[in-house]
Amino acid sequence: MSLSFLSECKEKVFQRIDTLLPDTNKIISAMRYSALADSKCIRAGLIFASGNLNKEISELALIDMATSIELMHTYSLIHDDLPSMDNDEMRRGQASNHIKFNEATAILTGDALQALAYENIVSSPEITQIQKISSIKALADACGHKG
């Protein structure tokens, strides 16, 4: 995957995240802070690259799938950075979520991003029912005890 391809993927995902998260309260601000932080979006790039091989998946479905995987990844990073885990103070070139906001807000933010990842898949009119089930299963496996 080229850097320009990843940059295009990132732009699509960040536009979708911006739509999903209008800045209306403290938790959403914290969600935006981490979800829209500078990142390579490699996971999203893998979704787009594999999806582009399958012409039965629409571009909009790929955007929703890629967005959900990035939201799930961001949730995992926020929780990983917590004082009770790795206690990292920096993430993606900026203060970790629990440093910028506080530990309780970071926990709620991560939880909300995880829920939004699932909600985004389930709510997408572009993703077929079979694709929704397999996507939710893959996300659950990745963030659960199998991941």
Predicted regions and their residues:
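Generic alpha-helical structural context detector
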Residues: 48, 67-70, 119, 137-144
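Secretory-pathway/luminal and periplasmic proteins that interact with or process carbohydrate-rich
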Residues: 74-77, 145-147
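All-alpha helical catalytic cores of prenyl diphosphate-utilizing isoprenoid enzymes
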Residues: 18-25, 38-40, 107-108, 115-116, ...
